[in-house]
Amino acid sequence: MLSLSSDVSHLLYDVVQQQIVRPLDLAFAKRHISSESKKAFAFLAISSALWRCGYPFLSIENERLFPSVSGISENLFYEYFQALPNYVLSSLFVIENNKIYLKSLYTVREKLFKKLSLLSQASNRYSLTTTTLSSLSQEQNEVFHKAVNSCFSLICGGPGTGKTFLAVQIIIALIKRYPKIRIAIVSPTGKATSHIRHILSKHHISEASVTIQTIHRFLQEHAYHQCTSFDLLLVDEGSMVTFSLLHSLVNTLSGENKRGEIIADNLIILGDENQLPPIGVGAGNPLQDLIARFPERALHLHVSHRAKTNRVQNFSKAILERQAIPFTPLPPMLTALSRIKEAFINTPSSQTQLCVLTPMRYGPWGYLRLNELIFHEIQKTHPELPIPIMITERYEAWGLFNGDTGYLCPKTQKLFFSHSRFIDAKEFSYYTYNYAMSVHKSQGSEYEDVIVIIPKGCETFDISILYTAITRAKNNIDVWADRETLYKIIKKPHKYTYGVDRLL
């Protein structure tokens, strides 16, 4: 760890003390410039903290640099930037349209966009020109036809609009028409691949016909030439995929020029552009950027086919329109624990009935501490109640993946999961309590009732955190929040995207 005395000048002291700038950011700065160049060093350290939080670029406007961090004005941040030597600037960054990008990320994004532009102009190897499916709505049929008859599509829609169902119908129709077609479905999480595998098995589609893998496993096997190219590559949970991974996926596609016409594989990306973007250095919001860059490739599903109460629908609609939502002031911890305990006691024994969601990992309102407190509170009076759990390690022999949820029966010491037989708890220890869950981990899951906790310290998030949390609920949603923090989140614009100018 870097020494505060030797590597932190008075310019950075406060932000280091507040843990806004961390040792990793100081190490990044020190790697590229001497700490004796105080202003330039400060710029690199602060910008590193912003890249680390997912901002894809910094904006220059009227000798101010946005966004900055607490305690460093935009004018001062710009002054630090001006002190950066040209050799450092040219080696690390790209400046375009008054925006500062990390060169490595900018290069990957531009390569991806170039390849997707070519793919957009190509002809599909396998098309279905006349098929209309009775199982699909008119809206879904329109998206179906456009997706199967092009080489690049973005199928976008909120929870319940039928993205996954539509993808399954596309697969069934293509296999029926072209039995030898090669199809792969990839997702950023094992939980999502497990869900798709379960749905396809209901339609008697085996992995002999369709390859289903996490993105990392798919790319790993492709790199070692353990799999051939595919005629259709379907990317599920596209809102969680970084530019870098998308670029690697596109590189697995093949194409050929036949008499001046490009014939290529088909890429379909499924996602909800309003959900949380991926976590990663300079990640931004790739799905929103793709929609902005390729609007003609974006196919939107608007109608929800999933039964959700008016309360849940009204909450999510209000959030997207940046309107105030009903909430309960965040109670003292003991009061909150008492209410949560009562809610779990009155909930049927199912891992999909109730969940507490929080954006925080650490601290009194982080899910690690909440799980510990809720567990001990319930054990005092109701030790026989089933304990909700979450898998923390992949175990393919049992069909379990990181993020899968279930429950532990205290009496029998058996673990139960919706798509798996029960497992002796003594034989499998890779799980944790799941009374409370991070909003990020909840993506792809649904619960009847959800309690969302928004404490102080969540001001760095935007409305995507609220939208994602609220849309996990099917029946009832309760928001417990610090009033000022909730207001700041609702009124705060989305984190920057590459395609749209937004200043915080």
Residue ranges of each PLM-predicted region?
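Conserved ATP-binding/catalytic motifs of P-loop helicase motor domains
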Residues: M1-L504
